[in-house]
Amino acid sequence: MGRSADNPLKDAFTSLGNVTVLFLDTLRSIFAKRFRVRDLVEQLHFIGVKSQSVVLLTGAFTGMVMCAQFYIQFHKVKMDSAVMSVVTVAMARELGAVLTSLMIAGRVGAAMAAQLGTMKVTEQIDALRTLATSPVDYLVAPRLLAMLISLPLLTAEAIAISMVSGMLVAVYLLGLDPVFLWSNMVFYTGSVDIWMGLIKAFIFAGIIATIACHKGMHCGQGAEGVGKATTEAVVAASITILVSNFFVTLILNKLLIYQN
């Protein structure tokens, strides 16, 4: 049995350290503006524009399902008009950022790991170093910056479409009064709720891009190595999102909500 199998905890902390170092190096590259704007635009198009269908479907059907489920419970206590306020707050604070990030991790994170993994296997990354070009500047920085820009916007889009779809279900399928639904939704939903979701999305964006790029740049040899790196990138990013969401929620609740 190999040493890596004997020390899974050590390997986990080593990977965490390597990912952290890559993230810090990439931040320095971004602030120093050592990336190419053309690469940034390409990544913005790939992450933001081409993820529209995934985000819209996720937000729309999540809003509809939550509205239909919450209505059953609220109807029992004669609080039908509060259905949409709960849906909106839940999406704004938690589900919007988490679900959108998980979908982007599966779609974009896998693609990033596969792209960089293929470049690693075909020795293109080594060629960049030979040409005195930093792989972090050329490959990682535009991907991380594009993710940091795109994911909060996609999350806001998912929250908005969930509100619209939930309202449509509440009004046209459940027969609720749109005026009361809207007034309750506006009253119980504040800017703090929206900011919580956007801050989480910003944090999750850094997690997805950094882990995906790290896994791709350190993949094994051959097609098997690329496939393994792609799978590990999605799994690691998804688990990290779910775990970090708990701690980020505690911190943001303390800073944004309990102080008000």
Language model features: what each stretch is:
Residues L116-A141, G222-V226:
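Short cytoplasmic-facing helical segments at TM-TM junctions of multi-pass membrane proteins
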